Amino acid sequence: MPSPSPAHTSFPAAQVWPLSARWFLVLGAISACTSVVFSAAFAHLPVFAGGVPTAVQTALSQQQFHSLGLLFTGLALRVCGASRWLQAAGWLMLVGLLLFSFNLYARHVLAWDTFRALVPWGGAAWILAWLALAVGLAQGSGRFNRQS
């Protein structure tokens, strides 16, 4: 009987999760990069000739901070292994970036006010992300466990 092709090979969940860790690391780095690009661009946009609005400055600082949170979540997944809580933390960080920071950018740069009501949900997503991260780290597995 022929051996199964790689497309039909099943992998345990623990082997699949590091791909998620890698993506959270990559997306965290890209988000950090875009926050620097946006900071520089916003400083020179004619629409902000009178100064960058406080809401945009807040969005930038929150994007930078939560980009680090994404990087940390990716590292935690690498160290702790498969964890639904850590996975949820990463996704909630991403949702928060979209609903909070990118929504405020669109609102102030493009005058796009369509999803203004979703901004607080981005903040709520970040709160839940940090709680999920705490639970995931507290449960621990792999090289990081409860005895450490």
Regions found by a protein language model. Name each.
Residues 2-148:
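Polytopic transmembrane helical bundles with strong interfacial aromatic enrichment
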